[in-house]
A protein has these predicted regions:
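Eukaryotic scaffold repeat domains enriched in small/polar residues
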Residues: 1-237
Length: 237
């Protein structure tokens, strides 16, 4: 089984095997678009990575599909094993995505329908979701706002303040997602790193974006190592 490593400093992907045999290491540092025809010849346009920060690899209809969070180039690059690009996911246009917000992807996962979920730096409304054809589907799995004393007090004041006073109030926003993963059943997991927050630190979400852990009553989190874990009918020590 192959292991894919992101070399952020050198802008490349390193592919190795479980044995880490140096003779079998592959490097992906140049990626090519489809042929662009001119009157005289076929020209292959190429591109490179700029501070990549995450990768997701899946298999679909016999092909190995590689999705790379190309952080500084503000895109998710999707390609085959030979480096041929079949899709670029870039900053969405339209009213749903703030034009003043950057598009710096940190990590990505892809479900069985090839929908793409992207963790973006400074986005607090959840992960950015794309369909397989590159269409922007909106946001998925936003964290809830931490119910602090200030937030609760602001809810009270909003009931009696004028519209002008409310506009001047400090906005309560959720914390951005730190990382994401997906299991073989299609459930998406997110973690949120914030020393002052306990809300939605760890989530397991269904296709609707609902946190199943909360529904099961797991509102309290225990930190540290577990001696055993129960998962899918089995106990792992």
């Amino acid at each position: 089984e192959k292991i894919y490593l992101v070399d952020q400093e050198n802008g490349r992907i390193i592919i190795t095997e479980e044995t880490f045999d140096p003779s079998k290491v592959e490097v992906m540092d140049t990626f090519k678009y489809s042929d662009v025809w001119t009157e005289s010849q076929s020209v292959i346009k190429k591109t490179t990575l700029n501070k990549p920060s995450g990768i997701f690899v899946t298999h679909y209809k016999g092909d190995t599909l590689i999705y790379i969070a190309d952080f500084a180039n503000e895109r998710v690059l999707a390609c085959y094993e030979d480096g041929s690009i079949f899709m670029e996911y870039t900053k969405p246009s339209g009213d749903l995505y703030d034009a003043n917000t950057t598009f710096n992807p940190k990590n990505i996962v892809v479900d069985n329908a090839l929908n793409v979920y992207v963790v973006i730096t400074s986005i607090t409304t959840g992960m950015v979701q794309f369909s397989s054809d590159g269409s922007f589907n909106g946001y998925y799995g936003a964290n809830r706002v931490e119910a602090t004393a200030e937030v609760i007090a602001n809810m009270f004041w909003k009931m009696i303040y004028t519209r002008e006073q409310i506009m001047k109030m400090k906005r309560a926003v959720s914390v951005e997602i730190s990382n994401v993963d997906i299991d073989e059943d299609g459930f998406i997991y997110t973690v949120t790193e914030n020393k002052n927050a306990n809300t939605d630190v760890l989530k397991k979400m269904n296709p609707a974006g609902t946190n199943i852990f909360t529904n099961l009553g797991y509102d309290e989190y225990t930190y540290g190592d577990f001696l055993s874990v129960y998962y899918r009918g089995k106990t792992y020590e």
